[in-house]
């Protein structure tokens, strides 16, 4: 799809050719108050009160999500006009805008319309800008058009008719909106990669497949890539990481990707993604029901790859390193057993009380490995605990950090990206739950505060740099009829990196 921006000051009576320009459809918003403004007011004037008559007749009441196509409207260059209900004007916030945009796209995608003029991004949205609206509309459209059918015997290869979207914005918003359109398309491409990797079955998306995906990404976007095999990891004394792969015939892969967009000596942001391509729980076997969804236990890794793809396409002036410890967690005669003690790369010994708490075992060695990059910040992303789902459900990702400044940046990014996160506690008192009689620490701390003690475990390996942990167990995929990977938290991570690149620190 092609996205472009065109300035148009409706309020000043300057439509800049939008009314007479040729297109398949122009999208216009109508509030529930039935008061016309902006593009709707101009079109009403150009059509001698047509919209006013339609509203008075009750054909369009402006209620949120309603749509109405008008055909061959006299005085309008577009062959169709799509009216979209916006709901209450004084409550037109980001959610209402998103709902309106999705309603418009659904209506348009049900037709053979190819080229559209989209005016909704010019509407006044509470606490949001026009460039935000452009990017949000692009992401909403790309989410609706995403499909995963490549594993079917007859994949759906049909192309959507909709190809070209022109966003109208006010003259002063044009520059920012053009950047937002570029970033929105790049972000959608990154999210699609993350979704694809998550939705692939685990007999396809193995640790080796993730490594090959990273290599292809490096080739396509001129990134630096290194993949460490098990012998190299043994030489680095990654005993914790390797303990998880002990039961699998699939070789573990330790993947390192580097994007160099900032100054050569500028400290990078390191993203560490949990890459368990299938998690049976190991000897501490999971229940059979729903185990198929454990192919999504690599969504942290997928989000790192998707974020790096988006960042590379955006050309952000920042250095980013992606680290992915990739394994399968399988039961077998060679698998790690409950009660085994392993030694991490840092040298700390870990009593493995539960082999289903494996994510932290691979992440801790990756977090130690990250020290060599002298990072400005490290963020790990993991489908780590079911306890986080109990605490936060499926709306907010869990954010853990002792660094208030870093946590604040991530929360700001989550709000800007509409990819919500909620800060969770990380008090030292929780560390007592990880005490072991036989090793330096245990890999679980009991049922109370399970997501917190998991983050506390990781914090023991992050003393060398500012660090945050995102638990995405509740947000990385959906179950039920809408089963599939969401692409989160790529928007949050990308926005964090956009903000870091913009403030100048990343180029120093």
From Swiss-Prot:
Listed GO biological process terms: proteolysis
Positions annotated to bind Mn(2+) 2: 274, 279, 297, 358
Catalytic activity: Release of an N-terminal amino acid, Xaa-|-Yaa-, in which Xaa is preferably Leu, but may be other amino acids including Pro although not Arg or Lys, and Yaa may be Pro. Amino acid amides and methyl esters are also readily hydrolyzed, but rates on arylamides are exceedingly low; Release of an N-terminal amino acid, preferentially leucine, but not glutamic or aspartic acids
Annotated positions binding Mn(2+) 1: 279, 356, 358
Pfam families: Peptidase_M17, Peptidase_M17_N
Main location: cytoplasm
InterPro entries the record matches: Leucine_aapep/pepB (IPR011356), Macro_dom-like (IPR043472), Peptidase_M17_C (IPR000819), Peptidase_M17_leu_NH2_pept (IPR023042), Peptidase_M17_N (IPR008283)
GO molecular function: manganese ion binding; metalloaminopeptidase activity
EC number: 3.4.11.1, 3.4.11.10
Cofactors (names): Mn(2+)
Subcellular localization(s) per the UniProt record: Cytoplasm
Enzyme class: hydrolase
Catalytic center residues: 286, 360
Taxonomy, superkingdom: Bacteria
Swiss-Prot/TrEMBL keywords: Aminopeptidase, Cytoplasm, Hydrolase, Manganese, Metal-binding, Protease
GO cellular component: cytoplasm
Family indicated by similarity: Belongs to the peptidase M17 family.
NCBIfam families xrefs: PRK00913.1-2 (NF002073), PRK00913.1-4 (NF002074), PRK00913.2-4 (NF002077)
HAMAP family found in the cross-reference section: Cytosol_peptidase_M17 (MF_00181)
Known function: Presumably involved in the processing and regular turnover of intracellular proteins. Catalyzes the removal of unsubstituted N-terminal amino acids from various peptides.
Protein name, as recorded: Probable cytosol aminopeptidase
Species annotation: Paraburkholderia xenovorans (strain LB400)
Gene name of this polypeptide: pepA
């Amino acid at each position: 799809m092609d996205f472009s921006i065109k300035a148009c000051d409706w309020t000043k009576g300057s439509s800049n050719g939008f009314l007479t320009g040729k297109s398949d459809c122009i999208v216009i918003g109508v509030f529930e108050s039935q008061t016309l403004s902006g593009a709707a007011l101009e079109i009403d004037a150009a059509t001698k009160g047509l919209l006013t008559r339609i509203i008075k007749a009750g054909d369009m009441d402006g209620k949120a999500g309603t749509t109405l196509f008008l055909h061959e409207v006299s005085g309008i260059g577009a062959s169709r006009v799509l009216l979209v209900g916006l709901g209450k004007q004084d409550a037109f916030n980001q959610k209402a805008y998103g709902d309106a945009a999705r309603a418009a796209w659904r209506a348009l995608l049900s037709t053979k319309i190819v080229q559209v003029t989209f005016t909704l991004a010019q509407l006044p949205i509470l606490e949001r800008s026009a460039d935000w609206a452009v990017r949000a509309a692009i992401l909403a459209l790309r989410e609706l058009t995403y499909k995963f059918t490549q594993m079917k015997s007859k994949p759906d290869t049909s192309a959507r008719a909709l190809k070209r979207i022109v966003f109208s914005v006010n003259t002063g918003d044009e520059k920012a909106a053009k950047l937002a359109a570029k970033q929105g398309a790049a972000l959608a491409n990154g999210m699609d990669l993350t979704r694809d990797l998550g939705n692939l079955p685990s007999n396809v998306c193995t640790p080796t497949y993730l490594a090959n995906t990273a290599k292809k990404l490096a080739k396509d976007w001129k990134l630096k890539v290194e993949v460490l095999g098990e012998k190299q990891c043994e030489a680095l004394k990654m005993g914790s990481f390797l303990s998880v792969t002990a039961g699998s015939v699939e070789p573990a892969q330790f993947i390192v990707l580097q994007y160099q967009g900032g100054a050569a000596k500028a400290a990078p942001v390191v993203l560490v993604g949990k890459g368990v391509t299938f998690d049976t729980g190991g000897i501490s076997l999971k229940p059979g029901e729903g185990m198929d969804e454990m192919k999504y236990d690599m969504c942290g890794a997928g989000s790192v790859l998707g974020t790096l793809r988006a960042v590379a396409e955006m050309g952000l002036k920042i250095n980013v390193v992606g680290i992915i410890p990739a394994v399968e967690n399988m039961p077998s005669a060679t698998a790690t057993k409950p009660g085994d003690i392993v030694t991490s790369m840092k040298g700390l010994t870990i009593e493995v009380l539960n082999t289903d708490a494996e994510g932290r075992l691979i992440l801790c060695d990756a977090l130690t490995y990250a020290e060599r990059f002298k990072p400005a910040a490290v963020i790990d992303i993991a489908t780590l605990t079911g306890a986080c789902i109990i605490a936060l459900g499926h709306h907010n990702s869990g954010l853990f950090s002792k660094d208030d400044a870093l946590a604040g940046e991530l929360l700001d990014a989550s709000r800007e990206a509409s990819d919500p996160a909620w800060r969770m506690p990380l008090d030292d008192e929780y560390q007592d739950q990880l005490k072991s009689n036989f090793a330096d620490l245990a890999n679980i701390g009991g049922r109370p505060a399970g997501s917190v003690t998991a983050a506390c475990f990781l914090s023991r390996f992050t003393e060398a740099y500012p660090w945050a942990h995102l638990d995405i167990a509740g947000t990385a995929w959906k179950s039920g009829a809408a089963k599939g990977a969401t692409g989160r938290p790529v928007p949050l991570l990308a926005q964090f990196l956009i903000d870091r690149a913009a403030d100048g620190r990343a180029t120093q």
